[in-house]
Structure formats: structure tokens, C-alpha cells
Amino acid sequence: MVRIAGTDIPDNKQVYFSLQYIFGIGPARSEKVLVQAGVDKAIRVNKLTDEEINRLREIIDKEYRVEGDLRKEIALNIKRLIDIGCYRGNRHKHNLPVRGQRTKTNARTRRGPRKTVAGRGQKRGATKK
């Protein structure tokens, strides 16, 4: 396996798809890196020469923020929003959707599993017999 930016990328796949295993590199950025390095995107990783692998490593390390650095930057951005006390920061702090989605129903992924409340199973106004 080839190791680029601290991530093992699979040997048996095309370079275009293998680069996407690195956090911070998606389809568009993968293609951009391959064009800059002058590597065919259809070639498999195990067919790459050492020179091509080094060019890919160099381009990714110099020009893009990936893996740990990117994760750290994202975490610091969220922390900054929380520290300044803005609306988005408060939404992050309370584990609610940040981008304006409804929360009366749905938003279960962000809010977590339902918290059951005693006595909520009956309809209002109904009396027991």
C-alpha cells in the first residue's frame, strides 16, 4: 500500500478513486492533483512509478490542507463560533442543526435518540376507565 498524507491508499484501485480516501480530497480535487502531477487518472496505484508517487505527495503536502490539519482547522472554526457566542455557535453548543433546518420534527440525527417522558403515551383529554 502507498501512504500519502498519513493515509494508506488502496493499491488495486484507480488513482482517481484512491486519492479520495484522504480526508479533504474529493472527486474535483483528486482530478486537479492528477492533472498537476501529470498522471493518468485511469491508471492503478500499483502501476505508479516512485517518481509519480513522490510528485503526488509533494503536490498534496504543499498545496492542500488535508487529514489532521484540516480536521484541526474545522474544530477550531467551530470552537471560535462557540466562543464568540453567535447564533451558529449556540446551535453547535446545543447539538442542534446549524443551517436553518426545522426541528419540531426530524433533526433526529443531530439531536440524538428520543428522550421519552412519563405520561406522554395518552391523548390529551382522554380519561381512563
From Swiss-Prot:
Pfam families: Ribosomal_S13 (PF00416). Residues 92-129 are annotated as: Disordered. Keywords: Ribonucleoprotein, Ribosomal protein, RNA-binding, rRNA-binding, tRNA-binding. InterPro entries: Rbsml_uS13_C, Ribosomal_uS13, Ribosomal_uS13-like_H2TH, Ribosomal_uS13_bac-type, Ribosomal_uS13_CS. GO terms for biological process: translation. Belongs to the universal ribosomal protein uS13 family. Located at the top of the head of the 30S subunit, it contacts several helices of the 16S rRNA. In the 70S ribosome it contacts the 23S rRNA (bridge B1a) and protein L5 of the 50S subunit (bridge B1b), connecting the 2 subunits; these bridges are implicated in subunit movement. Contacts the tRNAs in the A and P-sites. Part of the 30S ribosomal subunit. Forms a loose heterodimer with protein S19. Forms two bridges to the 50S subunit in the 70S ribosome. This is Small ribosomal subunit protein uS13. It comes from Dehalococcoides mccartyi (strain ATCC BAA-2266 / KCTC 15142 / 195) (Dehalococcoides ethenogenes (strain 195)).
